[in-house]
A protein has these predicted regions:
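Short hydrophobic alpha-helical segments enriched in small aliphatic residues
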Residues: 8-11
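Non-catalytic, conserved peripheral segments adjacent to functional cores
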Residues: 18-133, 152-154, 161-209
């Protein structure tokens, strides 16, 4: 059975489109399309540094809109996790969310999986290192599952959402699903730490039924 949010179509946006792996600078940000997965983007802000430290805009609606990310965010979240914590792969079923995620302390490997019905990249995943050092952000449109694993001793993770959290609307996929095949960069000997809920999510194969 198809989950309702899968009817979010992978349509062409009227806003500026960015070709696969092409970079474009708009205002104070650089946006890179993630391979051939339409709508999935890595955002890099301009950092102004001097002897005192640095300053950067982490979000500016006008700059993002010019770069093709015209989203109204309504909720900001922040989590703290220790090394080896893996959260995901999560989505909301009837209230799907656009997300803009970044790391303010530490380092994570962040993953998005395309679950949009009709998408040419349905079931394909993309991962990116987000860290306090590289200051990259990951824009994940509606219709994706999302998760991350912490690679540093600790990590502070923040994200903006285009819809509110609905606890009764949670969906998920098991993190190590063989059909999706996410290549988590987990060093040998590092223990993974998952919540009981994240250990029990279903498979991609069941999700498609």
């Amino acid at each position: 059975m198809w989950i309702p949010f899968l009817h979010i179509r992978n349509t062409k946006e009227a806003a500026l489109k960015i070709k696969s792996d092409e970079e474009i600078t708009m205002g104070k940000i650089k946006v890179t399309q993630c391979g051939d997965i339409e709508g999935l983007k890595v955002v890099e802000p301009t950092v102004f540094g001097d002897s005192r430290g640095y300053f950067m805009e982490t979000y500016n609606y006008n700059d993002f809109k010019e770069a093709g990310i015209d989203v109204q965010f309504v909720q900001d979240n922040q989590s703290s996790s220790r090394k080896g914590v893996l959260r995901g792969l999560h989505f909301q079923i009837n209230y799907p969310q656009d997300k803009l995620v970044r790391v303010v302390s530490g380092e994570v490997f962040d993953v998005a999986v395309d679950l949009r019905e009709g998408s040419e990249t349905f079931g394909k995943w993309y991962g990116v290192i987000l860290s306090a050092e590289n200051k990259k952000q990951f824009f994940i449109p509606k219709g994706f599952a999302h998760g991350f694993v912490v690679l540093s001793e600790n990590a502070e993770f923040t994200y903006k959402c285009s819809d509110f959290y609905h606890p009764n609307d949670e969906g998920g996929l098991i993190w190590n699903d063989p059909d999706i095949g996410v290549e988590w960069p987990v060093p040998e000997g590092m223990e993974l730490i998952l919540s009981e809920k994240d250990q029990k999510w279903g498979s991609f194969r069941d999700f498609r039924r």
